[in-house]
């Protein structure tokens, strides 16, 4: 084949892949610059069905794609060049695999003759993501390989996929055609003649039926299950599962609804949101120990107390409802797992429990904690929990919330306020890393343009400083609230042997502030040390069309001392 034909065929294959991905539901493509991925990049540049997002750092790019996929509820494509560019996606791919988020990596690669021989920027890319992605290895584009074969390969890998896919794309040089003009996918091209019908339509070449199989109990099984004292525990649920339906289910059965930070129901007035704290409240815990049936929606519970409660209780019946076949119970309880969305399971023919309202006193205990937190957090000293509660109480219907790992998400789980409504809430709790949190929030903010708040710790923000470049490009509100306690002060809550070891090897104090970082990326910045100033800055930031930073500086021990004091009060109640 002439070299010019090589460049053209490379481009045609890139265009076929991206066109088919668009037909399979992809709305966004995230791209990092690089030469070996040129056929994909040039095809993406001409693809009108995809929104393009560019960033120079592949690690941040992967997490931005993760955020876009979470917010759009659709697969997102990622284009990278060869070499370590691909490896930099690994953390985001791990998180996506564990939380069933569909990312599609399109990695440019060297042809076989340039692998394992010292060629530049060439590593073994197939299988680079190990168990965390479905692997597809494409050959170098070849006129003898029918375009239909390429499309069916993409279709089989991507259709109905809820987890990452890695499509490795080998290309020989030349990569750059001499000119770009006209349609890449020309119906008059002899090579594309077999695809004339496909080119005229808007559907995938291969159309797969939905593969999810739902399972549900019989009416008789439901009747037996609800005959006793039970609780409903709600773990991580995505917004599209319509968790609000579980409120009605709880009220119909007459069992309390115990909600995790990631349930979309943590602040709902009809839920028992303070369950983490109630499990150290003596009277509440004694009451909860009477339960002999549990219905768990989702998994990846945040509270160790709730996890211990589920593990230690002697359950007569334990049901768990998951949207996919998965094993999400580190305590390995004997149980029956049903495959359904929360909304679908709540719509079954449920009966009133014979022990309905058995735990109504929990409402009183939950209210007691609500008043305790108002007095001791909202009206107490300025600190991390106070800021988190203020954010959770501010315009929840107007915005979406991304809560960072380590201390922020635990403070929200322990102390989030009861509210009329809850902002749509996102976390990265698959692998629970502190990497890529800002980039993920940028992806969430970029999809719809809805105001978004990120609550992030100082070490997490330092870890993802490059992603301020993504934030700079946003045209919708993203409020980056940095809780700066000068290090990893979650370790104040853990039994590290002594204070010197804690300081030298765990907390890693840095003495840094973020004003110059904000200035470097030309982002609005405020540093606050009291609640009134925070509220003013926060409301202003929610109305600003772009990203802005609010830095909250607190002492290293503020949050841990407050947690200890509140724990003591709860235990003595």
UniProtKB/Swiss-Prot annotation:
Membrane-crossing segments per the record: none
The enzyme's E.C. designation: 2.2.1.9
Top-level lineage group: Bacteria
One GO MF term: magnesium ion binding
Pfam families, sorted: TPP_enzyme_C (PF02775), TPP_enzyme_M_2 (PF16582), TPP_enzyme_N (PF02776)
Cysteine pairings via disulfide bonds: none
A biological-process GO annotation: menaquinone biosynthetic process
Keyword Acyltransferase: no
Keywords, in A-Z order: Magnesium, Manganese, Menaquinone biosynthesis, Metal-binding, Thiamine pyrophosphate, Transferase
Pathway in which the depicted protein is active: Quinol/quinone metabolism; 1,4-dihydroxy-2-naphthoate biosynthesis; 1,4-dihydroxy-2-naphthoate from chorismate: step 2/7; Quinol/quinone metabolism; menaquinone biosynthesis
InterPro entries (UniProt xref): DHS-like_NAD/FAD-binding_dom, MenaQ_synth_MenD, MenD_middle, THDP-binding, Thiamin_PyroP_enz_TPP-bd_dom, TPP_enzyme_TPP-bd
Cofactor(s) listed: Mg(2+); Mn(2+); thiamine diphosphate
UniProt cross-references to CDD domains, sorted A to Z: TPP_PYR_MenD, TPP_SHCHC_synthase
Substrates-to-products reaction catalysed: isochorismate + 2-oxoglutarate + H(+) = 5-enolpyruvoyl-6-hydroxy-2-succinyl-cyclohex-3-ene-1-carboxylate + CO2
Cofactor note: Binds 1 thiamine pyrophosphate per subunit.
Family per similarity comment: Belongs to the TPP enzyme family. MenD subfamily.
NCBIfam families the record matches: menD
Assembly and oligomerization: Homodimer.
Protein function: Catalyzes the thiamine diphosphate-dependent decarboxylation of 2-oxoglutarate and the subsequent addition of the resulting succinic semialdehyde-thiamine pyrophosphate anion to isochorismate to yield 2-succinyl-5-enolpyruvyl-6-hydroxy-3-cyclohexene-1-carboxylate (SEPHCHC).
Protein name: 2-succinyl-5-enolpyruvyl-6-hydroxy-3-cyclohexene-1-carboxylate synthase
């Amino acid at each position: 084949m002439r070299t010019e034909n090589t460049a053209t065929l490379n481009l045609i294959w890139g265009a076929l892949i991206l066109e088919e991905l668009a037909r399979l539901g992809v709305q966004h493509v995230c791209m990092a610059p690089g030469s070996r991925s040129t056929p994909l990049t040039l095809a993406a540049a001409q693809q009108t069905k995809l929104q393009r997002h560019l960033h120079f750092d592949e690690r941040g790019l992967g997490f931005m794609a993760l955020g876009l996929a979470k917010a759009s509820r659709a697969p997102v494509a990622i284009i990278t060049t060869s070499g370590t560019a691909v490896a930099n996606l690994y953390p985001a791919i791990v998180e996506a695999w564990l939380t069933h988020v569909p990312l599609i990596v399109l990695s440019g690669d060297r042809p076989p003759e340039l692998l394992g021989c010292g060629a530049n920027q060439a590593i073994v890319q197939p299988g680079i993501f190990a168990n965390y992605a479905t692997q597809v290895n494409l050959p170098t584009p070849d006129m003898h390989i029918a375009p239909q074969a390429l499309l069916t390969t993409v279709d089989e890998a991507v259709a109905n996929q809820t987890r990452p896919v890695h499509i490795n794309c080998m290309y020989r040089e030349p990569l750059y055609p001499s000119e770009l003009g006209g349609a890449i996918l020309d119906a008059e091209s002899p090579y594309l003649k077999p695809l004339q019908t496909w080119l005229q339509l808007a559907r995938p070449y291969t159309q797969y039926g939905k593969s999810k199989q739902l399972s549900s109990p019989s009416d008789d099984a439901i009747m037996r299950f609800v005959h006793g004292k039970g609780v409903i525990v709600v773990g991580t649920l995505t917004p599209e599962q319509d968790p609000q339906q579980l409120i009605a289910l709880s009220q119909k059965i007459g069992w309390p609804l115990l909600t995790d930070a990631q349930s979309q129901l943590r602040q709902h007035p009809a839920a028992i949101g303070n369950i983490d704290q109630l499990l150290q409240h003596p009277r509440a815990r004694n009451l909860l120990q009477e339960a002999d049936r549990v219905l768990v929606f989702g998994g990846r519970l945040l509270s160790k107390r709730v996890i211990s409660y589920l593990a230690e209780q002697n359950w007569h019946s334990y049901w768990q409802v998951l949207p996919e076949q998965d094993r999400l119970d580190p305590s390995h309880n004997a149980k029956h797992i049903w495959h359904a969305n929360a909304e679908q399971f709540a719509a079954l023919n449920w009966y009133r429990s014979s022990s309905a309202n058995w735990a109504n006193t929990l409402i009183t205990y939950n209210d007691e904690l609500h008043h305790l937190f108002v007095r001791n957090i909202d009206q107490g000293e300025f600190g991390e929990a106070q800021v988190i509660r203020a954010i959770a109480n501010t315009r929840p219907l107007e915005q979406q919330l991304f809560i960072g790992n380590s201390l922020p998400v635990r403070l929200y789980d322990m102390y989030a306020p009861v509210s009329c409504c809850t902002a749509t809430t996102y976390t990265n709790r698959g692998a629970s890393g502190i990497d890529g949190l800002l980039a993920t929030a940028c992806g969430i903010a970029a999809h719809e343009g809805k105001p978004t708040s990120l609550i992030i710790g100082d070490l997490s923000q330092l870890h993802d400083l490059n992603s301020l470049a993504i934030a700079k490009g946003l045209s919708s509100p993203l409020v980056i609230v940095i809780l700066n306690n000068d290090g990893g002060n979650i370790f104040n809550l853990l039994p590290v042997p002594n204070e010197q070891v804690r300081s030298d090897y765990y907390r890693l104090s840095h003495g840094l502030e973020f004003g110059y970082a904000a200035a470097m990326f030309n982002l609005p910045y405020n540093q606050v040390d009291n609640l009134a100033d925070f509220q003013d800055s926060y409301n202003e930031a929610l109305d600003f069309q772009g990203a802005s930073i609010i830095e909250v500086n607190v002492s290293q021990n503020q949050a841990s001392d407050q947690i200890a004091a509140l724990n003591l009060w709860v235990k003595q109640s």
